[in-house]
Amino acid sequence: MTRAHLPGILAMAAIVLASNILVQFLFGQWLTWGAFTYPLAFLVTDLMNRIYGPGPARQVVFAGFIVGVFCSLIGTQIMLQGDGFTYPAVTLRIAIGSGLAFLTAQLIDVAIFDRLRQGTWWRAPLASTLVGSTLDTALFFTIAFSSGLTWIEPANDVSWANEVLPFLNVGPVAPLWMSLAVADWMVKLSLALVALIPFRMIVSKARPEQKSA
């Protein structure tokens, strides 16, 4: 790691920290405010990959993972008040799901980007982010809320997330967590397209000696 990599590490740390805070605040029926900041992690990873290469990009990913673990450890100690009961802000399943989803999705993003880096400028960031975002969403929501994985944390009642309701209020019935997952996924896909604009602008301004082939 060099001093030139520090902005990427700090940006990733800030995004992970902000997302862990904002996920506590709802936005509408299906989302939290964290859904709008978390996808920026893919932008940071892709910028580091394009400018410095896959090695520094992975270092940024590991830095973000460490910050995420730290946030989860703090969250498990913060108790919130429910209707006559208390519960941790971050359950074990959420902690495992978020950490595993982040690390797996980001490393896959780095690998796909590096494989496609010689093609059209937008193909590598778009394809890697779409695959990474899909994997991230599937892993997190399944691990955190699926009734089939209650053995991970038997004391954690996820019955609320498995309530059968019309999918996104308009489709056939499905567990609530699936609607939450798809809503989150659609935000990620939308931001993946929007992020191409700052990606192009930042890469074009990078010093020639910084750019990786």
List PLM regions with ranges.
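Membrane-interface helix termini and inter-helical loops of multi-pass transporters
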Residues: 24-28, 79-88, 149-155
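A generic, lipid-embedded transmembrane alpha helix
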Residues: 46, 67-77
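Structural signature of hydrophobic alpha-helical transmembrane segments
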Residues: 29-40, 89-101
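Helix-adjacent hinge/juxtasegments
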Residues: 73-97
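Alpha-helical transmembrane segments of polytopic integral membrane proteins
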Residues: 15-18, 24, 41, 45, ...
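Hydrophobic transmembrane alpha-helices
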Residues: 1-62
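Membrane-embedded alpha-helical hairpins and interfacial helices in multi-pass inner-membrane proteins
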Residues: 92-211
